[in-house]
């Protein structure tokens, strides 16, 4: 006969609500794709058009575009949060954000200069929808009196560190050693993975 403590351990994620497992892996895959792609951006924009061809832009152009992109990621969190609060709800906003991020990464994987800015725009918009709202869902897993709340956020934030480390390593290797668009495509594949893998 299974005692109560064993039953709780089977129906939890490191002693936390099972919903944290879904959010942990969603954030891990999203951060892996985001940082994996981000690590390639300036290199891809400034590398010449021979060999493993990039865009061949100047450092000034590349840094300006990178800065605008990074700024938009954080700015778009404001309308992303508003949409979740007032129109769509947190779960739908996170899902739509993940889908748009995936679309952006696959657009970046197309070896055309004309689609590059479009892909960046998709990733920025999707991140603005997903990033501010997924943490809110973590908070909703716990009551205000639940002592596990702080440690739950610690577990959740571990996914950010793990995902960023894997993203830089995997997408960076593919981008530099095989081809930039393989790195961008890997980021898209990671996005697809976190949308399709079973979470229970």
Go through the PLM ranges and name each one.
Residues 193-199:
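Conserved small/polar residues in nucleotide/adenosyl-binding loops
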């Amino acid at each position: 006969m299974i005692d109560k403590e064993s039953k709780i351990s089977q129906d939890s994620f490191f002693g936390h609500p099972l919903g944290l497992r879904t959010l942990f892996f969603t954030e891990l895959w999203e951060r892996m794709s985001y940082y994996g792609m981000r690590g390639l951006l300036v290199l891809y924009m400034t590398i010449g058009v021979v060999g493993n061809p990039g865009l061949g832009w100047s450092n000034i152009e590349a840094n300006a575009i990178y800065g605008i992109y990074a700024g938009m990621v954080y700015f778009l969190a404001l309308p992303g949060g508003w949409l979740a609060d007032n129109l769509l709800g947190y779960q739908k906003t996170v899902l739509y954000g993940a889908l748009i991020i995936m679309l952006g990464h696959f657009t970046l994987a197309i070896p055309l200069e004309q689609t590059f800015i479009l892909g960046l725009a998709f990733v920025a918009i999707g991140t603005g929808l997903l990033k501010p709202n997924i943490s809110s869902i973590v908070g909703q897993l716990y009551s205000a009196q639940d002592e596990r709340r702080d440690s739950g956020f610690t577990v959740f934030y571990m996914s950010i560190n793990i995902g960023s480390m894997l993203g830089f390593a995997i997408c960076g290797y593919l981008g530099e050693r095989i081809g930039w668009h393989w790195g961008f495509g890997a980021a898209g594949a990671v996005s697809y993975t976190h949308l399709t893998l079973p979470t229970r």
